[in-house]
Amino acid sequence: MQTLEEHCWSCSCTRGRDKKGTRLSTWLAQRAAKAMSSLNSLLSLAYHTLASSEGRSLIRRSLVLFAVGVFLALVLNLLQIQRNVTLFPEEVIATIFSSAWWVPPCCGTAAAVVGLLYPCIDSHLGEPHKFKREWASVMRCIAVFVGINHASAKLDFANNVQLSLTLAALSLGLWWTFDRSRSGLGLGITIAFLATLITQFLVYNGVYQYTSPDFLYIRSWLPCIFFSGGVTVGNIGRQLAMGSSEKTHSD
């Protein structure tokens, strides 16, 4: 009799476990089906977005901005390595790739994000441009930006305060000459703060090193370079967006 009761109890427990296992399997299957359905919807949306003219334009602008960021990172790195070097000997040219390999791709990615962000914020705020943009103005902005970086590497200043004030004045002059928008000023300051913070964190942890060992010197010019770089890349992104919109309307 006791054996029969134990057998019945074990059978009921087994059936209970089977029911729980069945419910759990059913619930997991339903969740998996919902997840697959959501994934298919996202993939379909991404495909249709990329297949559209706006999606193709976004990809083209991203690639151009990435290439510009990588190129500027290599050129500006060479200018910093070249401090107090007047000629271009082979050993100096070879040092253009002496930086960490991940720096140019990171700069390219940052340039793509910033360049796409500027026209989006302009469109969201509805802020009108102060003047008509053209590629000649954008090229002059790039030249001034490279000149500011070159000045920070070549010119000798009495102290860090003088260096900071000079580069800050040049950076604000670049913004006033080629931008003059509140969104450009705000984004430039935000980019300068965040990029300087991230860079100093990498230097502090030994992930990245500068050619100059003077930490105070580096800290004094770095925010100005990031600010002017953000304004420059933003102007490139705006010009690319304007060209893409004009081409879309003409089509």
From Swiss-Prot:
Residues 82-100, 157-159, 206-219 are extracellular. The chain crosses the membrane at residues 59-81, 101-118, 134-156, 160-178, 184-205, 220-237. The KxHxx motif mediates association with the coatomer complex. Keywords: Cholesterol metabolism, Endoplasmic reticulum, Lipid metabolism, Lipid-binding, Membrane, Steroid metabolism, Sterol metabolism, Transmembrane, Transmembrane helix. One of its GO terms (molecular function) is oxysterol binding. It comes from Xenopus tropicalis. Oxysterol-binding protein that mediates feedback control of cholesterol synthesis by controlling both endoplasmic reticulum to Golgi transport of scap and degradation of hmgcr. Acts as a negative regulator of cholesterol biosynthesis by mediating the retention of the SCAP-SREBP complex in the endoplasmic reticulum, thereby blocking the processing of sterol regulatory element-binding proteins (SREBPs). Binds oxysterol, including 25-hydroxycholesterol, regulating interaction with scap and retention of the SCAP-SREBP complex in the endoplasmic reticulum. The gene is insig1. This is Insulin-induced gene 1 protein. Belongs to the INSIG family. Interacts with scap; interaction is direct and only takes place in the presence of sterols; it prevents interaction between scap and the coat protein complex II (COPII). Associates with the SCAP-SREBP complex; association is mediated via its interaction with scap and only takes place in the presence of sterols. GO terms for cellular component: endoplasmic reticulum membrane. GO terms for biological process: cholesterol metabolic process.
